[in-house]
Curated annotation (Swiss-Prot):
Protein name (Swiss-Prot/TrEMBL): Glycerol-3-phosphate dehydrogenase [NAD(P)+]
GO molecular function, one term: glycerol-3-phosphate dehydrogenase [NAD(P)+] activity
Annotated InterPro entries: 6-PGluconate_DH-like_C_sf, 6PGD_dom2, G3P_DH_NAD-dep, G3P_DH_NAD-dep_C, G3P_DH_NAD-dep_N, NAD(P)-bd_dom_sf
Catalytic activity: sn-glycerol 3-phosphate + NAD(+) = dihydroxyacetone phosphate + NADH + H(+); sn-glycerol 3-phosphate + NADP(+) = dihydroxyacetone phosphate + NADPH + H(+)
Binding, NADPH: 10-11, 31, 104, 135, 250, 274, 276
Disulphide bond pairs: none
Residues bound to sn-glycerol 3-phosphate: 104, 131, 133, 186, 239, 249-251
Family that this chain belongs to: Belongs to the NAD-dependent glycerol-3-phosphate dehydrogenase family.
UniProt enzyme class: oxidoreductase
Organism of derivation: Caldanaerobacter subterraneus subsp. tengcongensis (strain DSM 15242 / JCM 11007 / NBRC 100824 / MB4)
């Protein structure tokens, strides 16, 4: 099967190598000419994952050639680039091609989910792939389970068949809203978990952040039309656990630096790669106001990273809020 993977960052590189092992004809496209020339010369991705690319993976800097005759097009660029790439794909891919989106985020300007942005330009079936899936582990064939979501069940099942093997298991879900929100919003809570670690707090604090974070993710999700049970699955609890606890998590690592006193700008510079939770915090904060949903953790993280609020003060505010029933608003 001809599969185009758009984006040669960590996720794009990992999924390209995975699909190549399944004997698909993989075309890996990257926007950066510098990165393209380096990979052509060395077949080694030094910036992302530090891995070698098999010679059977075809490399492209020309988007039109990369997607030509592709049966599946995988969008593996950061969320802020999804609109640009989707617009460039318009009229360039087969009407029968299935688009698989890996980006986890909410567009800051429009507050749209990634599949909504893609559908502005493409009439193709769009399948969302989400769940606890650090690229560093996927590329090493460490057992991983994720979820596929689409309104088109047949498209989901087609991708399930094409992408799945003994180390990469995929489930099908029709709740696109819930799967996308779970994948995006957990990055905010991971920032908070990192801030907690940076402040020197313990496991109790992180467990509370994760659990109450899941509660506010669920509240917003339900208000936006998703099934609350989705957040108990791989795109919800699963992704939340791995992103809040792993050293691979850029969001957690950025949070740790902020908790230790660095500014957002300093933290992002030190990470050196996209930290999706930063823009998602802006989007979620606005969505909570639009939908009238209580998201106290998101609100405090917003105040810390965008308004320079003292993290200790933010924790105090969370701990001294009005008394609540645990399932309030769910």
């Amino acid at each position: 099967m001809k599969i185009a993977v758009l984006g040669a960052g960590s996720w794009g590189t990992a999924i390209a190598i995975h699909l190549n092992k399944l004997n698909h004809q993989v075309r890996l496209w990257m926007r950066s000419k510098e990165q393209f020339e380096e990979l052509i010369a060395t077949r080694h991705n030094s910036r992302y994952l530090d891995v070698d690319l098999p010679s059977s993976i075809l490399l492209y800097n020309d988007l039109d050639k990369a997607v030509e005759d592709s049966e599946v097009v995988v969008i593996a660029v950061p969320s802020h680039a999804v609109r640009e790439v989707s617009e460039k794909l318009k009229g360039k891919i087969s009407k029968n091609a299935i688009v698989v989106n890996l980006a986890k985020g909410i567009e800051t300007s429009s507050l749209k989910r990634m599949s909504e942005v893609i559908k502005e330009y493409l009439l193709n079936p769009v399948v969302v792939l989400s769940g606890p899936s650090h690229a560093e582990e996927v590329v090493r064939q460490i057992p991983t389970a994720c979820v596929l979501a689409s309104e088109d069940v047949k498209a989901c099942e087609f991708i399930q068949e094409a992408f799945m093997n003994e180390t990469f298991r995929l489930y099908v879900n029709t709740d696109v809203i819930g799967v996308e929100l779970g994948g995006a919003l957990k990055n905010i809570i991971a920032l908070g978990a990192g801030i907690s670690d940076g402040l020197g707090f313990g496991d109790n604090t992180k467990a509370a952040l994760m659990t109450r974070g899941l509660a506010e993710i669920t509240r917003l999700g339900v208000a936006m039309g998703s099934d609350p049970l989705t957040f108990l699955g791989l795109a919800g609890v699963g992704d939340l656990i791995v992103t809040c606890t792993s050293n691979y998590s850029r969001n957690r690592r950025a949070g740790i630096l902020i908790g230790k006193g660095k500014s957002l700008k300093e933290a992002l510079k030190e990470i050196g790669m996209v930290v999706e939770g930063v823009n998602t915090t802006k989007s979620a904060y606005r969505l909570s106001q639009i939908y009238g949903v209580e998201m106290p953790i998101t609100k405090e993280i917003y105040s810390i990273i965008f308004e320079n609020k003292n993290p200790f003060e933010a924790v105090y505010n969370l701990m001294t809020r009005d008394k609540k029933h645990e399932l309030h608003g769910i």
